[in-house]
């Protein structure tokens, strides 16, 4: 007679159970743009364990300046963070502890980034990358191991946000230099094959100047059109990358973020005719297209409405906390705020640096 043993009978007595790490909090990196052509961009670091915010964080660790007008920051993987330093014409790489670990120096006038963990994709307003020249702007593909540009694709004039969905890059063309150069504003989102770096087609949104960052919730992109600051009003575009169809809304989403399901937007509408700003706080459900006034709860919405010059909004993918900044005068120190989804503050108001424009969270586990 044969007896079959259960799998547990074969397990060693000294087997150690696997314990999943527990999220205990998150630190923040705030990328302060400084003033254009002043070479005073900075990183600020908020330590959630100590409650201390450190300005000039990058410089204190590396003994050098970050550079002139850092325009985007992105966590590429667990060990690498990329910073697009626009007017210094470099992409600076750091580890999460702040130590510099290389740079890419042949993508001038760089703007916005996305990544699949293996490659970094970055837009540029420039007309040159290494020995290649372009009539308009382009997207560069960078190997994150070597930090070398491996391919480029010419797109429209002055491309801004770039996002990746199912092997395709979606590039928001602006034509933002139309006021000073001999071309029109752009209205298109360009679709590029991320593998071959060939342009596939353009999606004409009918809205000009697709400027500022875009947020991505699954297949949906939230894109800002800021108009021409005169007679052409700003809009928000929500694109479904599966069908490449879109909805258009009659308000801007200059600063936008997502929890993976909805978009939370703060729109800044400026008019050269009046010299005034109007601000909008909206929540968009991309699935059914509905829009509601306000963001998350009354406490957060009212705080956002009290800001002098809102300059960034970011929702943590780890905690669901929402963080935002106030640039105030654009020439002196700005401020950082953090709230839980129920409207309770994460910390007291934090003084950062000039034009705090980009935020990422670093999760902490035990």
Predicted features along the sequence, with ranges:
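Post-signal peptide N-terminal segment of secreted/secretory-pathway proteins
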Residues: 39-117, 129-130
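Short, solvent-exposed loop/turn segments at conserved positions within beta-propeller repeat blades
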Residues: 35-39, 84-87, 128-137, 178-187, ...
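Beta-propeller blade signature
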Residues: 43-47, 135-144, 185-194, 235-240, ...
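A short beta-strand motif characteristic of beta-propeller blades
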Residues: 52-65, 98-105, 148-153, 198-205, ...
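Residue position within the beta-strands of beta-propeller blades
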Residues: 30, 83, 122-124, 171-172, ...
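Bacterial Sec-dependent N-terminal signal peptides
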Residues: 1-28
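Acidic, serine/threonine- and glycine-rich low-complexity intrinsically disordered segments
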Residues: 154, 159-270
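Repeated scaffold domains used in trafficking and secretory/extracellular systems
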Residues: 18, 65-74, 108-117, 157-166, ...
């Amino acid at each position: 007679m044969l007896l079959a043993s259960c799998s547990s009978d074969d397990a060693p007595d000294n087997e150690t159970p696997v314990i999943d790490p527990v999220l205990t909090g998150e630190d923040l990196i705030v990328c302060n743009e400084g003033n254009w052509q002043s070479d005073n961009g900075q990183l600020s670091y908020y330590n959630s364990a100590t409650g201390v915010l450190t300005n000039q964080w990058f410089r204190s660790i590396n003994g050098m300046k970050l550079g002139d007008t850092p325009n985007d920051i992105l966590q590429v993987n667990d060990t690498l963070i990329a910073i697009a330093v626009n007017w210094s014409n470099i992409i600076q790489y750091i580890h999460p502890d702040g130590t510099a670990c290389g740079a890419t120096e042949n993508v001038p006038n760089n703007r916005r980034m996305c990544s699949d963990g293996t490659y970094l994709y970055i837009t540029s307003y420039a007309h040159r990358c290494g020995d290649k020249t372009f009539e308009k702007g382009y997207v560069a593909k960078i190997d994150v191991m070597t930090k070398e540009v491996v391919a480029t694709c010419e797109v429209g004039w002055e491309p801004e946000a770039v996002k990746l969905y199912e092997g395709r890059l979606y590039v928001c063309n602006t034509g933002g230099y139309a006021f000073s150069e001999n071309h029109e504003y752009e209205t298109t989102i360009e679709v590029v094959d991320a593998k071959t770096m060939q342009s596939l087609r353009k999606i004409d949104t009918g809205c000009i100047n697709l400027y500022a960052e875009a947020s991505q919730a699954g297949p949906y992109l939230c894109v800002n059109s800021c108009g021409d600051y005169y007679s052409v009003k700003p809009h928000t575009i929500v694109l479904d990358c599966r069908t490449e169809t879109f909805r258009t809304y009659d308000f801007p989403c200059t600063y936008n973020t997502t929890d993976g399901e909805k978009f939370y937007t703060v729109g800044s509408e400026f008019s050269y005719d009046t010299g005034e700003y109007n601000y909008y706080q909206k929540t968009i459900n991309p699935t059914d297209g509905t829009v509601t006034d306000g963001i998350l709860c009354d406490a957060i919405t009212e705080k956002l409405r009290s800001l002098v010059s809102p300059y960034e909004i970011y929702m943590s993918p780890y905690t669901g906390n929402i963080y935002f900044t106030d640039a105030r005068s654009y020439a002196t120190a700005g401020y950082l705020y953090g709230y839980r989804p129920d409207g309770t503050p994460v910390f007291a108001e934090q003084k950062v640096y000039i034009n705090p424009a980009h935020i990422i969270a670093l999760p902490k586990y035990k």
